[in-house]
Amino acid sequence: MDEDILVVNGSQQGIDLICKALVGKNTVVLAEGPSYSVALHCFQCAGARVVTVPLLADGPDMDAIRAVVDPTPIDFYYTMTNFQCPSNVYWSERKRRQLLALAQEN
């Protein structure tokens, strides 16, 4: 619906608004390393604990994600599946499906 769309000036403004609305002192954010440093800084300034997992040639290290998610419930996963910044990695279809399955389990 139209009321569910928010137009912003750029990614930094969108990330800032997400932080203001969804991120707090006890928020756990999962992200790939390396990742967009401005976003990670914004999450940390909002009080989140950012946990990073290695990024491989075809997407994130799924074993590392499972190792984080099993003992630590995460609130959200900050990622870019197409042309990830700064690595320009493009996730494989297999990694996308694995992440979806993991999200549905948790």
Set out the residue ranges of the language-model regions.
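Conserved core of the PLP fold type I
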Residues: M1-N106
